[in-house]
Amino acid sequence: MGLFDFLFGKGKGTSSGSPKKGLKRITVAKRFELSGRTGQGSMSKVYRAYDRELGRTVCLKILDKAKTKKFEERFAGLKKPHEGEVCMTLRHDNIVRSFEHGITSDGEPYLVMEWVEGLGLNYLVETRAPQLKGNRINYLGQLCDAVQYMHDNKWLHRDLCPRNVMVDKEGVLKLIDFGLTVPYTPAFCIGGNRTGTSDILAPEIIKRKTTDHRVDLFALGVTAYEVFTGQLPWERSVSSEETFRRRLNQKPRTAKELNPQVGDDLSAVLLRAIEREPGDRFPTATAFKDALGKVEKQDY
């Protein structure tokens, strides 16, 4: 029995994704010296902190217990692992390293991760940072490696977007935030759950169809569009439903239309990555990486 099955079992079950009994319990003020909040998601707060027990600077993520419970109710009857349980199984150079997870004295789930000294990929894209020049294909290749690792180990990230990617000072990319990650099993691929970032949801999710790893590959393609053009393939609308309608019914803008510096070969690769039909996309993240590596111009 593998670690995945040992932790979470197979398929359907009666337990929720809530933290299990017997987890380590801590008092945040005693264990950590907080030096500032670095981010806040819809269900969590993230801090830079000095961990007195580990003797190092770490990233401390504390989840809101009420919001987390409400989110997990969407997976009633399934053995959805808690984010901390997911993170503790992931060991890859391009995935943020997690050291520990448990419960605070206030009853909130927490996660202790490595501190990444760097910038978010979303910031690099939005500011058109010089750091991107000549590194776009390299960064995306690293992201493909992280995604392939997750799929090989039976996980679907389900929220791949520039906001969830960090690039450290050495140019090493780190995939972060596994709050929406689910096991890659039939029970979690049943259509109906449209949880996720609207900009990157694949058509089959929007149509509430059965899904597989190619929902991540679609999101990877949209992320690549943003990296090369600074824009989304489809114009964003103030309404999620209108955004979805455009994605289902309108042709995407080509990367070359959005950025004339993009060559025809790269533009074609990016279009294939976001095909509406899953079978028309690249079959794996590695295949997408290989296609990017074959475009004539590599110094984007």
Q: What is the predicted function of each stretch?
A:
Residues 145-155:
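Protein kinase catalytic-loop region centered on the HRD/HxD motif
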Residues 67-89:
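AlphaC helix of the eukaryotic protein kinase fold
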